[in-house]
């Protein structure tokens, strides 16, 4: 994992003072590092009858689509409001300083689907928890959640209430 960790750039005081931002853009720019990250992200789930990967907007789309390709399954984007052109299911959830909403097409998933949830970062777990609930509201099963980075001190894993979580890098 040292090869991947070397591709994460630390940006102090972004997006506001006191925050240390973990920038994944050097990782996604490097083809060898990106291949390694995707392989390591999905490796624990090979052979587990995953039927789809759901990616959380926006950086989850990068890793989620590639994870779906690696697993040979489809990709389902979980979007911010007003971005999907068809009928949607939505979920509202609380953030540290406000609220947010995610949407998914009503016909994207259903009973019998086993979904791997993918995002770049697990922090407090609010977005991931809401994403899991959104997928389950369509009748699908959340098989596991996979993240490139987990910020352990923020205890996002606990917010996922015992769900299976796989993270490549811990900070």
Swiss-Prot record:
It catalyses: AMP + diphosphate = 5-phospho-alpha-D-ribose 1-diphosphate + adenine. It is found in: Cytoplasm. Keywords: Cytoplasm, Glycosyltransferase, Purine salvage, Transferase. One of its GO terms (biological process) is purine ribonucleoside salvage. Disulfide bonds: none annotated. Pathway: Purine metabolism; AMP biosynthesis via salvage pathway; AMP from adenine: step 1/1. GO terms for cellular component: cytoplasm. GO terms for molecular function: adenine binding; adenine phosphoribosyltransferase activity; AMP binding. Its EC number is 2.4.2.7. It holds the Pfam family Pribosyltran. The keyword Glycosyltransferase applies. InterPro entries: Ade_phspho_trans (IPR005764), PRibTrfase_dom (IPR000836), PRTase-like (IPR029057), UPRTase/APRTase (IPR050054). It is an enzyme of class 2 (transferase). Catalyzes a salvage reaction resulting in the formation of AMP, that is energically less costly than de novo synthesis. Homodimer. NCBIfam families: apt, PRK02304.1-3, PRK02304.1-5. PANTHER family: ADENINE PHOSPHORIBOSYLTRANSFERASE. Belongs to the purine/pyrimidine phosphoribosyltransferase family. HAMAP family: Aden_phosphoribosyltr. This is Adenine phosphoribosyltransferase. It comes from Methylococcus capsulatus (strain ATCC 33009 / NCIMB 11132 / Bath). The lineage of its organism: Bacteria, Pseudomonadati, Pseudomonadota, Gammaproteobacteria, Methylococcales.
């Amino acid at each position: 994992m040292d090869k991947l960790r070397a591709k994460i750039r630390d940006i102090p005081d972004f997006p506001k003072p006191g925050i240390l931002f973990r920038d994944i853009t050097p990782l996604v720019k490097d083809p060898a590092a990106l291949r390694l990250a995707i392989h390591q992200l999905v490796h624990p789930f090979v052979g587990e009858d995953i039927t789809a990967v759901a990616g959380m907007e926006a950086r989850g789309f990068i890793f989620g689509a590639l994870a779906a390709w690696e697993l040979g399954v489809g990709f389902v984007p979980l979007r911010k409001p007003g971005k999907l052109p068809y009928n949607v299911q939505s979920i509202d959830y609380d953030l540290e300083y406000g609220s947010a909403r995610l949407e998914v097409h009503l016909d994207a998933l259903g009973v019998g689907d086993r979904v791997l949830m993918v995002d770049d970062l697990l922090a407090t777990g609010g977005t991931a928890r809401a994403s899991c609930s959104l997928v389950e509201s369509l009748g699908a099963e959340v098989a596991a959640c996979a993240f490139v980075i987990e910020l352990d001190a923020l205890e996002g894993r606990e917010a996922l209430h015992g769900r299976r979580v796989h993270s490549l890098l811990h900070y």
